[in-house]
Amino acid sequence: MLILKDEDIRRLVTMKEAIAAVEKAFGELAKGRAMMPPRSTMMLEKGSISLMPSYLQETGTVATKIISIYAQNPAKGLPTSIAQIIANDPETGKFIALIEASYLTALRTGAVTGVAAHYLAREDSKVAAIIGCGVQGRTQAWAVIESRDIETFRCYDLSKERRRAFAEEMSRTLEVEVLPVDRAKEAVKDADIIVTATTSKIPVVKKE
């Protein structure tokens, strides 16, 4: 059985490739050539665990993601979401791969935003706002810049330290201006693209 860890995915898959794969999967699902049943979620006292099965006819790929979401994990030095993917042989059901998928989940979720930015955002978009400066915020920013020629990101997070660290890291990584701001309202003002990457249960971006 093939075993892949997060560092393998980082080395093997680029954001551009992830965006192309997600766009292809959306198309196959729309054409009825893929199956993606609703996720099954078990709610626990401190978090949730979900099962997400899928099948892609063109490649004969059968895979199920198991993902846990625990909002308090960062305080324990752990990521909010932890995921694994099990792949099966479609002919026999035999396990053929086990994939550590926390990074892949962030990459894939970012890629969805990349597809959306390509088709929905104006071609002349130059300013983007990122609300939430965790792992997901990073892949969201990466995906947006793969789809549009963004010149400036404005980032907001409840943690001043996180937004400053995000701005420093992502300005180097993406080679664009990334500005940390003190309020979500400042981040989204006059932004061409707004991305939320937060587990907040109350609105962070408001109509006014």
Language-model segment annotations:
Residues 137-138:
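N-terminal Rossmann-fold NAD(P) dinucleotide-binding loop
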Residues 175-208:
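Rossmann-like adenosine-cofactor binding region
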Residues 1-106, 114, 124:
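N-terminal ligand-binding/catalytic initiation module
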Residues 133-134:
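Glycine-rich Rossmann-fold phosphate-binding loop(s) that bind the pyrophosphate
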Residues 146-174:
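NAD(P)-binding Rossmann-fold cofactor-contacting core
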Residues 120-127, 149:
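Short helix-loop-beta connector
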Residues 129, 152-154, 179:
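A structural signal for isolated positions on well-ordered beta-strands in alpha/beta enzyme cores
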